[in-house]
Amino acid sequence: GSPVTQEEYNKIVETQLTELWSNYGKLFEIWFDGGVLSQQNGGADILTLIQRLQPNSIAFQGPYGYPNLIRWVGNEEGNSPYPCWATADATTSADGVQKIKGLYGNPHGNYWCPGEADFTLRRNDSFQGGWFWRANEDHLIFSTDELLLKYETSVGRNTNMLLGLVIDKNGLVPDADVK
């Protein structure tokens, strides 16, 4: 195909987000993996859309100016830094580009932007780091004790815990993962 302009791309993004944010009820969290290119820098008008269509959702690495932001803590192991402050400055909450100095938040930060510790139920040596299902990998599921430790190093350190589950070829969470 032929390349699209940034303007055409923005229209595609805005159309798709309008569909997703309009047809499936209230969303709890909207995930922007890698952050959001601001409108001032040529990106789509995400802020206006989210404020109009999903104003109560939490936005992971969402657009600058949105009041319900959460931020990445620097790894996908469920291991938040300590201490981990729920306030941050603009460099840790605005553009999705996490500066290492900002992983702890900022106790004097001007923005309420708590951390989120994401990790998968399956170990990182499984297919695609545990974010996607593949047969014969049930042995890579974390034990209850390991999950409790991840809870302590995420929620116990003042961050939201996001547990990534796989969906199998039938569109379901596998029985082994549910147990």
Task: Annotate each language-model stretch with its function.
Residues G1-K179:
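Mature catalytic domains of secreted/periplasmic carbohydrate-active enzymes
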